[in-house]
UniProtKB/Swiss-Prot annotation:
This is Cytoinsectotoxin-2c. Keywords: Antibiotic, Antimicrobial, Secreted, Toxin. One of its GO terms (cellular component) is extracellular region. GO terms for molecular function: toxin activity. Belongs to the cationic peptide 06 (cytoinsectotoxin) family. The lineage of its organism: Eukaryota, Metazoa, Ecdysozoa, Arthropoda, Chelicerata. Expressed by the venom gland. GO terms for biological process: defense response to bacterium. Both the N-terminus (1-33) and the C-terminus (38-70) of the mature peptide form alpha-helices which probably disrupt target cell membranes. The linker region (34-37) probably derives from a processing quadruplet motif (PQM), found in propeptides of many zodatoxins, hinting at a fusion of two originally separate membrane-active peptides. It is found in: Secreted. Insecticidal and antimicrobial peptide. Has insecticidal activity against larvae of flesh fly S.carnaria. Has antibacterial activity against Gram-positive bacterium B.subtilis B-501 (MIC=1.25 uM) and Gram-negative bacterium E.coli DH5alpha (MIC=2.5 uM). It comes from Lachesana tarabaevi (Spider).
Amino acid sequence: SWDSIWKSAKNKMDKIMRQKVAKWMAKKEGKSVEEVQAKVDAMSKKDIRMHVISHYGKKAFEQLSKSLEE
């Protein structure tokens, strides 16, 4: 059914977002992904989404700035 497909896709997306945020935080803090993973697992879904939005927002802003300088 559509419900089970949607839940499955949503769970996979949440898992991928958690992995991405852990990777970014580990890089930022200079720690291993495993060390940061517990902190990420304790975060709410809203906090994780905010990390994803801010990360991609910064990238978009940097690209826009570069294109305006040229």
